[in-house]
């Protein structure tokens, strides 16, 4: 069976991979080895064996670049020894993207799955990493709104007017609070619902809204508005 080694220091991505593997094992077309880079693993024979056992290696990292000791060594090892990988490293002033044997149309769709988020999109990401089919035969990402206003029950509205018509009071002032989109997707909305009730109790419209930080037209992420 094919194996994907997913190396990341991004907490939400790690959660999505874990949940995809735990929830939908029957949908996955290969095995997943997850390496949490929040604390870089020791580079030893065991780690190299994990690299060698993987048919595909995907690396996502935020905060330090490929000039950091571990990532520099990883990039050099993959370049010398591995047939298929994709490294996407973001640091404050630049982004480094390196890859081998992943065509641009496949990278764009894999990135779209990853950035759109959601457990099923990570199932598609895992399967897409293994796939030899043309992307015309791949599934599109689930259409999860990039920005929305949350209602009392955790439901969402695409516009302010939609929210006001359904749950708002036109004669009240409004208080807006931003939260992260991935929190809504994962159902981590306890504090958002508590804020909603507290703001509403004082007769203000609670505009509890999420968005996606940073636009990316290449994969359809709009500017927040």
Feature locations, PLM:
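An N-terminal assembly and electron-transfer interface module characteristic of large anaerobic redox
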Residues: 1-225
């Amino acid at each position: 069976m094919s194996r994907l080694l997913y190396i990341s220091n991004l907490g939400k991505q790690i959660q999505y991979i874990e949940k995809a593997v735990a929830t939908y094992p029957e949908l996955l077309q290969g095995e997943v080895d997850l390496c949490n880079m929040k604390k870089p693993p020791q580079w030893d024979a065991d780690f190299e064996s994990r690299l060698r056992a993987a048919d595909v290696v995907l690396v996502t990292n935020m905060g330090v670049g490929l000039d950091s000791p571990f990532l520099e060594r990883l990039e050099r090892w993959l370049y010398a020894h591995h047939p298929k990988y994709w490294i996407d490293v973001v640091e404050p002033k630049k982004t480094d993207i390196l890859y081998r044997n992943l065509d641009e149309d496949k990278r764009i769709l894999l990135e779209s799955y990853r950035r759109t988020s959601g457990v099923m999109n990570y199932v598609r990401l895992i399967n897409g990493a293994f796939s030899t089919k043309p992307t015309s035969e791949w599934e599109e990402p689930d259409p999860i709104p990039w920005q929305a206003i949350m209602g009392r029950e955790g439901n969402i509205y695409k516009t302010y007017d939609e929210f006001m018509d359904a749950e708002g009071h036109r004669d009240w002032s409004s208080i807006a609070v931003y939260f992260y989109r991935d929190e809504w997707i994962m159902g981590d909305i306890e504090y958002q619902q508590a804020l909603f009730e507290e703001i509403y109790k004082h007769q203000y419209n609670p505009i509890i809204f999420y968005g996606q930080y940073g636009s990316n037209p290449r994969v359809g992420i709009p500017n927040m508005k």
